Amino acid sequence: MNYEVKEQMYEGKAKQVFATSDPEIVMVHYKDDATAGDGEKKGTIRDKGIVNNKLSNALMQKLEKEGIPTHYVQEINDRDTFVKKVEIVPLEVIIRNVAAGHFTLRMGVPEGTEFKTPILEFSYKNDDLHDPFINHYYALALGLATQE
């Protein structure tokens, strides 16, 4: 599949989204930018965009193999992927294996502490509210998820 990449539609902390010649397909470009503390701390992590692109694509392809539809269309190169244009759900899923960032402040756990079991967290992606943590009841009540 070959789509002509057009104007930028969106730029966030981790990626840029571009329109293509097909109105149902967009191109996602993964950046090396890194932020912390509600964007107060900014930096660059070499090849972060490559890792994020490759990992995201591997996960989407695995889901597709299991019969779960995704937005994945085609990896273009190390940083860019064509995906179906979708409505973004403002929900962040966080899986922690090691204590880092805000978790250490909230829970009083030393940075680098390895957990006996992974910790699953959800946050409501809203910059004005500083991405508050929510549970599945919030996600259902706010229409961010369904029981299925």
Regions found by a protein language model. Give the residues of each.
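A long amphipathic alpha-helix within ATP-dependent nucleotide-binding catalytic cores
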Residues: 144-148
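Active-site loop/lid in soluble adenylation, ligation, and acyl-transfer enzymes
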Residues: 2-123
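A structural motif
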Residues: 123-142
